A protein has these predicted regions:
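N-terminal low-complexity segments enriched in Gly/Pro/Tyr/Ser
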Residues: 2-6, 10, 14, 21-24, ...
Length: 257
């Protein structure tokens, strides 16, 4: 009974955490995280050292094409860089844990729910941990300029879509929706219970950057040079993420239903 209660509590925390990011994905440029989640001095940082759009575009380039539920978790997790390093080290020591056993074990760790949810995706954790400077910059930008970051995600998705590099596949669906007079590109898992992490070269999918893209990390065997998007083996996420998030929950997240 204790394990069930812990798992239920973690699932609810993950729902709450991702729902906040979902509301940001809903209408880029308008929705902000609740004020209490912003660190002291964030307002001053925004006005004194606001990151320009071109730099934000490059900052989000490595993850902008992630399916929305994974994008939400990754952005939230990037605000906890130390815990990302701790999770990577923990995963190295617990390679034998899989599925529910992994979910139960990680739920006992004192980490943010967004960090715990990434335990099922070690390649994403490795990407974030291997370039912790970029991850920290991404997290700081998300805390200080949430809507600007989401606008950047949409700009990069539009670039990839215009070049024919972002479209519906067996692994994910891509739709363009108009919400509150804004055109938004929605990326969802083809199977809500299975995540496929895309690997890609930003220069190939978006074109040459104005501001240099972060270094590229490719999971072993996942990416073929010159291809747009490559996908690895699908990962069942039911034990970690209960229910759908991202654009699929836009009405709930925005308070419309």
């Amino acid at each position: 009974m204790k394990n069930v209660n812990v798992q239920s509590r973690i699932s609810l925390q993950i729902r709450s955490c991702t729902a906040v990011v979902c509301s940001l994905l809903l209408v880029p440029g308008e929705t902000l995280l609740p004020a209490q989640t912003q660190p002291a001095g964030a307002s001053a940082q925004t006005t004194s050292a606001k990151i320009p759009p071109d730099q934000l575009d490059s900052l989000v380039a490595p993850i902008a094409l992630y399916p929305d539920p994974l994008l939400a978790q990754t952005l939230a997790a990037s605000t906890y860089p130390l815990e990302i390093i701790q999770l990577q080290q923990w995963l190295e020591k617990n390679k034998n844990l899989k599925d529910k056993a992994l979910a139960d074990a990680v739920a006992k760790e004192p980490w943010d729910p967004s960090i715990q949810a990434l335990a099922a995706l070690p390649d994403v954790v490795k990407r974030l941990a291997n370039d912790i400077s970029w991850t920290t910059d991404l997290g700081n930008a998300f805390l200080a300029q949430q809507t600007d970051v989401m606008d950047a995600v949409q700009r990069m998705r539009k670039k990839a879509q215009d070049k024919g590099n972002l479209k519906t596949t067996e692994q994910q669906t891509v739709e363009t929706k108009v919400i509150e007079n804004k055109s938004v590109i929605v990326v969802q898992q083809a199977n809500p219970q299975v995540i496929y992490v895309p690997s890609y070269d930003p220069v190939v999918v978006y074109g040459p950057p104005i501001y240099p893209y972060p270094p590229i990390y490719y999971p072993t065997g996942y990416y073929v040079a010159g291809m747009a998007l490559s996908f690895g083996i699908g990962v069942m996420t039911g034990a970690f993420w209960i229910g759908g998030w991202g654009w699929g929950c836009w009405a709930v997240c925005s308070g419309l239903v």
